[in-house]
Amino acid sequence: MTIDPTRSGPAEEDRAGSAVGRVLGRLRRVGTGGPETPPERMRILTIGGRAIRVAVREGAPGRPPLLLCNGIGVSLELFQPFVDALDPQRPVIRFDMPGIGGSPAPVVPYHLVTLPSLLAGLLDQLGYEQADVLGISWGGGLAQQFALSRPDRVRRLVLVATAPGALMVPGHPRVLLRMLTPRRHRDPGYAAHVAGELYGGSAREDPIVARDLLHATTRLGPARGYYYQLISILGWTSLPRLPRLRPPTLILAGDDDPIIPVVNARIMHRLIRRSTLHVYQGGHLELAADPERLASAVQAFLDADLTADGSQP
């Protein structure tokens, strides 16, 4: 059967409806909470002269917060399903990169090595000395740089569908070429058309789910915000410094990720001394598309050294 990627007929709606409805229902709850989920506060913070949109879910006192670093071009709403799948007592901090979502575009480009000060300033303004940090895709590079530059601020590190930067095993050239523009974030039909090829995993079977995840709530700013984020990682690599990563690290990688081949996770696992590797069935977007499955692995890792009440010993 051939599926028209620019529209969804009755068969496709029936097949994808339950998954989309479940995920998108949670996406629309950003900031409101639910019967089991604490409400989140959305605010604009000025950090180092940059206006940054931030969402904070308050958790139980004494529990370390989880700071989420997004991938390229996506706003903080994309991972609402993952946040909702976590223990509601866990504080969670999300933010939009400059020029993405609700954060205004910067006037001039920036580089990844300058961004640890942004994360440190964010934690300072929210009153946290230390955080668990999760980075996915591009955000995994930011999480690595933060842990290398400010190891005192990172308690535990989770790297999802990511790589060590320039010195990585790349995906297929056609896939990387499609990543050079923000079109998939602006054109729903195109997003469905390329979802399987780009993201693999569940997106191959249900490109409509991937399309709706990308377009449910994302508020993409000027195109230069995407391009600034894209070029910020040029020339950057963590590879020779990975043995110096101090925090305990969980590496999550999909066995069908066209953007970041799983071999990169195996290389990182070999180089990061205190690391655990978990290879899951799926692709690049499973943290949002199938959050319950991966949330359990993340929570078990983050809670490994906490006391019974969830606080640090």
Regions found by a protein language model. Name each.
Residues 258-264:
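Conserved alpha/beta-hydrolase "acid-adjacent" motif
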Residues 245, 251-253, 257:
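Short beta-strand/loop motif that positions the catalytic acidic residue
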Residues 282-295:
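Catalytic histidine-centered segment of alpha/beta-hydrolase-like enzymes
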Residues 94-134:
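Active-site loop/oxyanion-hole signature of alpha/beta-hydrolase fold enzymes
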Residues 1-66, 89-90, 303-313:
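Alpha/beta-hydrolase fold catalytic core
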Residues 144, 148, 155-184:
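Flexible "cap/lid" loop of the alpha/beta hydrolase fold
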Residues 50-102:
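Conserved HGGG/HGGXW glycine-rich cap/lid loop of the alpha/beta-hydrolase fold
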